[in-house]
Curated annotation (Swiss-Prot):
Organism: Arthroderma benhamiae (strain ATCC MYA-4681 / CBS 112371)
Database matches in PROSITE patterns: SPASE_I_1
NCBIfam families named among the record's database cross-references: sigpep_I_arch (TIGR02228)
Name of the gene encoding the protein in the UniProt record: SEC11
Membrane topology, Cytoplasmic segments: 1-15
Protein name: Signal peptidase complex catalytic subunit SEC11
Length: 200
């Protein structure tokens, strides 16, 4: 392998050009992701199903495409949300939806405090409608999964997006990379070598 790399190592200009090409590929992918985030209004427009809680609708490893431009999430809609303080997206179905303030005074106060924190002092912080979710394959609803003192999810504060499409099993690659961090290093190394070996 080193014999094949020798011509590139002896020619710094060509090596630099290949490295810049590799950086261009990575930056293009990053910009594409950001553009998709802006278009869908979602911080994570594509997510992977990590558990079997939504079977048979979705299996572990399915790749989901999200849309977050709708002001409401209706009963029966499948949404992805983040629990406060945790960075793990959960994919579950809406089983109850409430208009603004209909979710109970305790939940309403929490939502107003969260809205104030995120919007800053002196800015308006309207509270959107609330919802209760549940996995299709789960017996109980998600109340136990929510943050302490939280009774319902808030559409604006907690929801990453609503599922609009999916590709089965494709997400297993990312699950494998997450469960085996060394595979990321190997994959990046292989990509780097392939770029270096490309002929101009």
């Amino acid at each position: 392998m080193f014999a094949e790399l020798a011509p590139y190592l002896s020619n710094p200009r060509q090596t630099l050009a290949q490295l810049l090409n590799f950086a261009l590929v990575l930056s293009t992918a990053f910009m594409g992701w950001k553009a998709l985030s802006v278009y869908t209004n979602s911080s994570s427009p594509i997510v992977v199903v990590l558990s079997g809680s939504m079977e048979p609708a979705f299996q572990r490893g399915d790749l989901l495409f999200l849309w977050n431009n709708s002001p409401r999430a209706e009963v029966g809609e499948i949404v992805v949300y983040n629990v406060q303080g945790k960075d793990i997206p959960i994919v579950h179905r809406v089983i109850k939806a409430f208009g603004t303030g209909d979710g109970g005074k305790k939940s309403q106060r929490r939502l107003e405090r969260e809205a104030d924190k995120r919007s800053g002092p002196g800015l308006s912080s309207p509270v959107s409608h609330q919802m209760l979710t549940k996995g299709d394959n789960n017996i109980a609803d998600d109340t136990e999964l929510y943050a302490q003192g939280q009774d319902y999810l808030d559409r604006k504060l907690d929801i990453v997006g609503s599922v609009r499409g999916y590709i089965p099993a494709v997400g297993y690659v990312t699950i494998m990379l997450a469960e085996n961090p060394w595979m990321k290093t190997v994959l990046l190394g292989i990509m780097g070598v392939m770029v270096m070996l490309q002929r101009e």
